[in-house]
Amino acid sequence: MCIEIENYKQHDLFNYFDYNQIDNDAEDLLNTLLNISEYNLKLNKRRVPVMEIAKVLGFNIYTTKFNDYNVKATIGISNQLINKYKSNKVIILSSEYTDEEILFSLCYELAHYIYDSNPSNEYSHTYRINDIELRAIRFADALLMPITSFKEAYTELSSNINNQELLIHALSNTFNAPQVVVQRRIKQVINTYENH
């Protein structure tokens, strides 16, 4: 049990859609987890230890080939999972995607755990489409590419790389994130930041 996440989940998150606040909270939660020595979490340069964070949160992680190629991941929280998975918290990721896509999907499922699961109810979702998805996507972006680190990396790399495509590729390698997610993060953080 990760008390830091459980404490955070005590906030009323039902209508929590302020994207700047989500960026800051994701970074604060990450820094809190990184600073707890018993978790032994470390950044690999700028890469966030997403798998290790999920394990600290009590999840068992599995990969499989889903029948539906469009399913990238699913999350389940239920005591009924214990017999099969040896845990009541499971995230299953598609093995048919790149490592970067798998890490993003894991961040996305962690966002649903933080914002949408209720400890008193079982929780399981695979397909979701609505504003809650946008919130989960934003949190996943912010966890995989924390705002401060992303701004620093963007500034550092863009001073040496003038080609936008090469810059996106370099940022993708820096954060181990899908290029499409890097493009979205640039729009969220850099374009917004430069317009103020």
Enumerate the language-model features and the residues they cover.
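Active-site hotspot residues in diverse enzymes, especially metal/ion-binding acidic/histidine motifs
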Residues: 1-196
